[in-house]
Amino acid sequence: MALYELFSHPVERSYRAGLCSKAALFLLLAAALTYIPPLLVAFRSHGFWLKRSSYEEQPTVRFQHQVLLVALLGPESDGFLAWSTFPAFNRLQGDRLRVPLVSTREEDRNQDGKTDMLHFKLELPLQSTEHVLGVQLILTFSYRLHRMATLVMQSMAFLQSSFPVPGSQLYVNGDLRLQQKQPLSCGGLDARYNISVINGTSPFAYDYDLTHIVAAYQERNVTTVLNDPNPIWLVGRAADAPFVINAIIRYPVEVISYQPGFWEMVKFAWVQYVSILLIFLWVFERIKIFVFQNQVVTTIPVTVTPRGDLCKEHLS
Protein backbone atom coordinates (compact mmCIF):
# COMPACT_ATOMS: atom_id res chain seq x y z
CA MET A 1 0.00 0.00 0.00
CA ALA A 2 1.44 3.38 -1.03
CA LEU A 3 1.96 6.00 1.66
CA TYR A 4 1.22 9.68 1.22
CA GLU A 5 2.10 12.65 3.34
CA LEU A 6 -1.14 13.83 4.87
CA PHE A 7 0.12 16.41 7.35
CA SER A 8 3.36 18.05 8.42
CA HIS A 9 4.53 20.76 10.79
CA PRO A 10 7.95 22.30 11.42
CA VAL A 11 9.98 21.32 14.45
CA GLU A 12 11.54 24.24 16.26
CA ARG A 13 15.16 23.83 17.30
CA SER A 14 16.91 26.24 19.62
CA TYR A 15 20.63 26.64 20.26
CA ARG A 16 21.84 27.50 23.73
CA ALA A 17 25.09 29.05 24.87
CA GLY A 18 26.42 31.46 27.46
CA LEU A 19 26.15 35.23 27.13
CA CYS A 20 29.93 35.53 26.89
CA SER A 21 30.32 32.78 24.31
CA LYS A 22 31.37 33.04 20.68
CA ALA A 23 27.79 32.28 19.64
CA ALA A 24 26.45 35.28 21.57
CA LEU A 25 29.17 37.47 20.10
CA PHE A 26 28.27 36.22 16.61
CA LEU A 27 24.59 37.08 17.13
CA LEU A 28 25.50 40.57 18.33
CA LEU A 29 27.69 41.10 15.28
CA ALA A 30 24.99 39.72 12.96
CA ALA A 31 22.39 42.08 14.46
CA ALA A 32 24.70 45.06 13.96
CA LEU A 33 25.39 44.04 10.35
CA THR A 34 21.67 43.53 9.75
CA TYR A 35 20.30 46.86 10.99
CA ILE A 36 23.11 49.41 10.58
CA PRO A 37 24.24 48.90 6.92
CA PRO A 38 20.70 49.46 5.50
CA LEU A 39 20.65 52.81 7.28
CA LEU A 40 24.03 53.75 5.79
CA VAL A 41 23.03 52.58 2.31
CA ALA A 42 19.78 54.56 2.39
CA PHE A 43 21.54 57.66 3.73
CA ARG A 44 24.46 57.54 1.26
CA SER A 45 22.15 57.03 -1.73
CA HIS A 46 20.89 60.62 -1.20
CA GLY A 47 17.30 61.66 -0.73
CA PHE A 48 17.02 59.86 2.62
CA TRP A 49 15.75 62.96 4.39
CA LEU A 50 13.01 64.66 2.42
CA LYS A 51 14.09 68.32 2.39
CA ARG A 52 11.58 69.56 -0.17
CA SER A 53 8.23 68.35 -1.37
CA SER A 54 5.47 69.72 -3.58
CA TYR A 55 1.74 69.54 -4.10
CA GLU A 56 -0.92 71.14 -6.28
CA GLU A 57 -3.33 73.79 -5.07
CA GLN A 58 -5.45 76.47 -6.64
CA PRO A 59 -4.79 79.66 -4.67
CA THR A 60 -7.48 81.97 -3.39
CA VAL A 61 -6.86 85.17 -5.35
CA ARG A 62 -8.85 88.38 -5.16
CA PHE A 63 -8.26 91.58 -7.09
CA GLN A 64 -7.76 94.47 -4.65
CA HIS A 65 -8.88 97.17 -7.09
CA GLN A 66 -5.56 98.96 -6.81
CA VAL A 67 -4.22 100.19 -10.16
CA LEU A 68 -1.23 102.24 -11.25
CA LEU A 69 -1.08 103.21 -14.93
CA VAL A 70 1.57 105.01 -16.98
CA ALA A 71 0.81 105.52 -20.69
CA LEU A 72 3.85 106.45 -22.76
CA LEU A 73 3.01 108.96 -25.50
CA GLY A 74 4.62 109.68 -28.85
CA PRO A 75 7.38 112.30 -29.22
CA GLU A 76 4.94 114.93 -30.46
CA SER A 77 3.05 114.72 -27.15
CA ASP A 78 6.24 115.01 -25.10
CA GLY A 79 5.86 112.64 -22.18
CA PHE A 80 3.28 110.41 -20.59
CA LEU A 81 -0.10 110.21 -18.92
CA ALA A 82 -0.59 108.63 -15.51
CA TRP A 83 -3.30 107.65 -13.10
CA SER A 84 -3.74 105.39 -10.09
CA THR A 85 -6.21 104.56 -7.38
CA PHE A 86 -3.87 106.27 -4.88
CA PRO A 87 -4.80 109.95 -4.35
CA ALA A 88 -1.28 110.86 -3.23
CA PHE A 89 0.13 109.61 -6.53
CA ASN A 90 -2.48 111.50 -8.54
CA ARG A 91 -1.64 114.76 -6.76
CA LEU A 92 1.97 114.41 -7.87
CA GLN A 93 1.08 114.14 -11.59
CA GLY A 94 -0.25 117.64 -12.22
CA ASP A 95 -1.25 118.12 -15.88
CA ARG A 96 -0.20 114.57 -16.72
CA LEU A 97 -3.07 113.10 -14.72
CA ARG A 98 -5.75 111.52 -16.90
CA VAL A 99 -8.64 109.67 -15.25
CA PRO A 100 -9.74 106.56 -17.19
CA LEU A 101 -12.90 104.48 -17.09
CA VAL A 102 -12.19 101.16 -15.36
CA SER A 103 -14.43 98.10 -15.21
CA THR A 104 -13.55 94.77 -13.58
CA ARG A 105 -15.23 91.43 -13.07
CA GLU A 106 -13.97 88.29 -11.36
CA GLU A 107 -15.38 84.94 -12.44
CA ASP A 108 -15.67 81.56 -10.75
CA ARG A 109 -16.08 79.28 -13.73
CA ASN A 110 -16.25 75.90 -11.98
CA GLN A 111 -18.34 77.11 -9.01
CA ASP A 112 -15.88 75.85 -6.39
CA GLY A 113 -15.91 79.04 -4.34
CA LYS A 114 -12.59 80.29 -5.72
CA THR A 115 -12.31 82.91 -8.45
CA ASP A 116 -10.68 81.59 -11.60
CA MET A 117 -10.05 84.75 -13.61
CA LEU A 118 -10.22 88.52 -13.71
CA HIS A 119 -11.71 90.52 -16.57
CA PHE A 120 -10.10 93.96 -16.53
CA LYS A 121 -10.89 96.79 -18.91
CA LEU A 122 -9.47 100.32 -18.84
CA GLU A 123 -10.43 103.10 -21.26
CA LEU A 124 -8.03 106.05 -21.23
CA PRO A 125 -9.43 109.19 -22.92
CA LEU A 126 -7.00 110.85 -25.34
CA GLN A 127 -6.85 114.04 -27.29
CA SER A 128 -6.61 113.86 -31.06
CA THR A 129 -2.91 114.78 -30.91
CA GLU A 130 -2.02 112.17 -28.29
CA HIS A 131 -0.83 108.73 -29.36
CA VAL A 132 0.06 105.87 -27.03
CA LEU A 133 3.24 103.94 -27.81
CA GLY A 134 3.60 102.00 -24.59
CA VAL A 135 1.90 101.00 -21.38
CA GLN A 136 3.10 100.25 -17.85
CA LEU A 137 0.40 98.85 -15.59
CA ILE A 138 0.39 97.46 -12.04
CA LEU A 139 -2.56 95.54 -10.57
CA THR A 140 -2.48 94.27 -6.98
CA PHE A 141 -4.00 91.06 -5.59
CA SER A 142 -4.65 89.27 -2.33
CA TYR A 143 -3.07 85.81 -2.60
CA ARG A 144 -3.74 82.91 -0.19
CA LEU A 145 -2.69 79.27 0.14
CA HIS A 146 -4.35 76.93 2.65
CA ARG A 147 -3.73 73.25 2.01
CA MET A 148 -0.21 72.31 3.19
CA ALA A 149 1.60 75.63 3.44
CA THR A 150 -0.49 78.50 4.80
CA LEU A 151 0.46 81.71 3.03
CA VAL A 152 -1.21 85.12 2.99
CA MET A 153 0.35 87.88 0.92
CA GLN A 154 -0.36 90.87 -1.25
CA SER A 155 1.08 90.49 -4.72
CA MET A 156 0.99 92.23 -8.06
CA ALA A 157 0.82 91.72 -11.80
CA PHE A 158 3.11 94.02 -13.75
CA LEU A 159 2.36 94.57 -17.43
CA GLN A 160 4.75 96.47 -19.67
CA SER A 161 4.44 96.73 -23.45
CA SER A 162 5.80 99.18 -25.98
CA PHE A 163 5.60 99.33 -29.77
CA PRO A 164 7.00 101.62 -32.47
CA VAL A 165 3.56 102.51 -33.87
CA PRO A 166 0.66 104.17 -32.00
CA GLY A 167 -1.97 101.76 -30.76
CA SER A 168 -5.67 101.80 -30.10
CA GLN A 169 -5.90 98.80 -27.80
CA LEU A 170 -3.72 96.41 -25.83
CA TYR A 171 -5.13 92.92 -25.37
CA VAL A 172 -3.63 90.63 -22.72
CA ASN A 173 -4.64 87.06 -21.90
CA GLY A 174 -2.33 85.45 -19.39
CA ASP A 175 -1.86 83.63 -16.10
CA LEU A 176 -0.97 85.01 -12.70
CA ARG A 177 1.78 82.54 -11.79
CA LEU A 178 3.46 81.98 -8.45
CA GLN A 179 7.25 82.23 -8.28
CA GLN A 180 9.23 80.82 -5.34
CA LYS A 181 12.88 81.37 -4.54
CA GLN A 182 12.66 79.01 -1.57
CA PRO A 183 10.12 76.43 -0.36
CA LEU A 184 7.37 77.49 2.01
CA SER A 185 7.15 76.26 5.58
CA CYS A 186 4.37 73.78 6.29
CA GLY A 187 3.90 74.90 9.88
CA GLY A 188 2.11 78.07 10.94
CA LEU A 189 0.93 81.10 9.01
CA ASP A 190 3.38 82.81 6.66
CA ALA A 191 2.34 86.46 6.50
CA ARG A 192 5.74 88.02 5.78
CA TYR A 193 4.50 89.63 2.59
CA ASN A 194 1.01 90.54 3.69
CA ILE A 195 1.89 94.19 3.15
CA SER A 196 0.92 96.58 0.38
CA VAL A 197 3.02 96.36 -2.77
CA ILE A 198 2.64 100.13 -3.24
CA ASN A 199 2.86 102.54 -0.32
CA GLY A 200 -0.28 104.42 -1.25
CA THR A 201 -0.13 106.78 1.73
CA SER A 202 3.31 108.17 0.93
CA PRO A 203 3.49 111.77 -0.40
CA PHE A 204 6.90 111.15 -2.00
CA ALA A 205 7.32 110.48 -5.71
CA TYR A 206 10.09 107.96 -5.02
CA ASP A 207 7.61 105.50 -3.49
CA TYR A 208 5.63 105.46 -6.77
CA ASP A 209 8.63 105.08 -9.06
CA LEU A 210 8.17 101.87 -11.02
CA THR A 211 11.82 100.87 -10.78
CA HIS A 212 11.64 101.20 -6.99
CA ILE A 213 8.37 99.26 -6.76
CA VAL A 214 9.60 96.41 -8.98
CA ALA A 215 13.02 96.24 -7.29
CA ALA A 216 11.48 96.04 -3.81
CA TYR A 217 8.98 93.44 -5.01
CA GLN A 218 11.69 91.23 -6.50
CA GLU A 219 13.47 91.10 -3.14
CA ARG A 220 10.69 88.83 -1.93
CA ASN A 221 11.14 85.08 -1.80
CA VAL A 222 7.56 84.54 -3.00
CA THR A 223 6.03 86.65 -5.78
CA THR A 224 3.47 86.48 -8.56
CA VAL A 225 4.13 87.37 -12.17
CA LEU A 226 1.81 87.89 -15.12
CA ASN A 227 2.72 85.28 -17.70
CA ASP A 228 1.63 86.45 -21.14
CA PRO A 229 4.31 86.00 -23.79
CA ASN A 230 2.24 87.47 -26.63
CA PRO A 231 0.28 90.64 -25.81
CA ILE A 232 -1.69 91.91 -28.81
CA TRP A 233 -1.19 95.54 -29.86
CA LEU A 234 -4.03 96.85 -32.02
CA VAL A 235 -3.62 99.96 -34.18
CA GLY A 236 -6.01 102.31 -35.95
CA ARG A 237 -7.57 104.51 -33.28
CA ALA A 238 -10.20 107.09 -34.18
CA ALA A 239 -9.49 110.71 -33.23
CA ASP A 240 -12.00 110.81 -30.37
CA ALA A 241 -11.65 107.17 -29.28
CA PRO A 242 -9.96 106.21 -26.00
CA PHE A 243 -6.99 103.90 -25.67
CA VAL A 244 -8.23 100.58 -24.30
CA ILE A 245 -6.47 97.99 -22.18
CA ASN A 246 -8.39 94.73 -22.21
CA ALA A 247 -6.92 92.04 -19.96
CA ILE A 248 -7.96 88.56 -18.91
CA ILE A 249 -5.88 87.28 -16.01
CA ARG A 250 -6.35 83.66 -14.97
CA TYR A 251 -5.63 82.15 -11.56
CA PRO A 252 -4.37 78.65 -12.40
CA VAL A 253 -3.59 75.66 -10.19
CA GLU A 254 -0.03 75.96 -8.89
CA VAL A 255 2.63 73.42 -7.91
CA ILE A 256 3.65 74.60 -4.45
CA SER A 257 7.11 73.75 -3.10
CA TYR A 258 7.31 73.41 0.68
CA GLN A 259 9.50 72.09 3.49
CA PRO A 260 7.94 68.90 4.90
CA GLY A 261 7.31 68.51 8.61
CA PHE A 262 9.13 66.12 10.95
CA TRP A 263 6.71 63.20 10.70
CA GLU A 264 6.52 63.42 6.92
CA MET A 265 10.33 63.27 6.80
CA VAL A 266 10.34 60.25 9.12
CA LYS A 267 7.69 58.47 7.05
CA PHE A 268 9.65 59.02 3.84
CA ALA A 269 12.95 57.87 5.43
CA TRP A 270 11.30 54.84 7.07
CA VAL A 271 10.00 53.49 3.77
CA GLN A 272 13.49 53.63 2.25
CA TYR A 273 15.14 52.05 5.28
CA VAL A 274 12.67 49.16 5.59
CA SER A 275 12.86 48.32 1.87
CA ILE A 276 16.63 47.78 2.20
CA LEU A 277 16.38 46.19 5.66
CA LEU A 278 14.16 43.36 4.35
CA ILE A 279 16.96 42.20 2.06
CA PHE A 280 19.50 42.19 4.91
CA LEU A 281 17.08 40.34 7.20
CA TRP A 282 16.62 37.59 4.61
CA VAL A 283 20.37 37.22 3.96
CA PHE A 284 21.47 37.16 7.60
CA GLU A 285 18.67 34.79 8.57
CA ARG A 286 20.12 32.28 6.10
CA ILE A 287 23.64 32.92 7.43
CA LYS A 288 22.55 32.32 11.05
CA ILE A 289 20.78 29.08 10.11
CA PHE A 290 23.93 27.83 8.38
CA VAL A 291 26.23 28.82 11.27
CA PHE A 292 24.15 27.18 14.01
CA GLN A 293 23.12 24.06 12.08
CA ASN A 294 26.74 23.31 11.16
CA GLN A 295 28.04 24.25 14.64
CA VAL A 296 30.48 26.84 13.30
CA VAL A 297 30.19 28.28 16.81
CA THR A 298 29.72 25.88 19.70
CA THR A 299 26.16 25.68 21.04
CA ILE A 300 23.86 23.08 22.57
CA PRO A 301 21.01 22.20 20.17
CA VAL A 302 17.65 21.65 21.83
CA THR A 303 14.50 20.50 20.08
CA VAL A 304 11.56 22.46 21.38
CA THR A 305 8.47 20.34 21.95
CA PRO A 306 5.24 22.02 20.80
CA ARG A 307 2.92 23.11 23.63
CA GLY A 308 0.18 20.76 22.45
CA ASP A 309 2.48 17.75 22.79
CA LEU A 310 3.46 18.83 26.31
CA CYS A 311 -0.20 18.85 27.31
CA LYS A 312 -0.69 15.32 25.94
CA GLU A 313 2.34 14.01 27.82
CA HIS A 314 1.09 15.57 31.05
CA LEU A 315 -2.37 14.03 30.67
CA SER A 316 -0.93 10.63 29.96
Swiss-Prot record:
Top-level taxonomic group: Eukaryota
Membrane topology annotation: Multi-pass membrane protein
Subcellular location: Cell projection, Cilium membrane
Pfam families: TM231 (PF10149)
UniProt record, GO biological process: camera-type eye development; cilium assembly; embryonic digit morphogenesis; in utero embryonic development; neuroepithelial cell differentiation; regulation of protein localization; smoothened signaling pathway; vasculature development
Annotated GO CC locations: ciliary membrane; ciliary transition zone; MKS complex
Transmembrane spans: 23-43, 262-282
Principal location listed in the UniProt entry: membrane
Keywords on record: Cell membrane, Cell projection, Ciliopathy, Cilium, Cilium biogenesis/degradation, Disease variant, Glycoprotein, Joubert syndrome, Meckel syndrome, Membrane, Transmembrane, Transmembrane helix
Residues the record marks as carrying a glycan: 194, 199, 221
Subunit structure and binding partners: Part of the tectonic-like complex (also named B9 complex). Interacts with TMEM107.
Associated clinical condition: Joubert syndrome 20: A disorder presenting with cerebellar ataxia, oculomotor apraxia, hypotonia, neonatal breathing abnormalities and psychomotor delay. Neuroradiologically, it is characterized by cerebellar vermian hypoplasia/aplasia, thickened and reoriented superior cerebellar peduncles, and an abnormally large interpeduncular fossa, giving the appearance of a molar tooth on transaxial slices (molar tooth sign). Additional variable features include retinal dystrophy and renal disease.
The family this protein is said to belong to: Belongs to the TMEM231 family.
Protein's job: Transmembrane component of the tectonic-like complex, a complex localized at the transition zone of primary cilia and acting as a barrier that prevents diffusion of transmembrane proteins between the cilia and plasma membranes. Required for ciliogenesis and sonic hedgehog/SHH signaling.
Protein name as catalogued: Transmembrane protein 231
The species this protein was found in: Homo sapiens
Lineage, top ranks: Eukaryota, Metazoa, Chordata, Craniata, Vertebrata
Gene: TMEM231
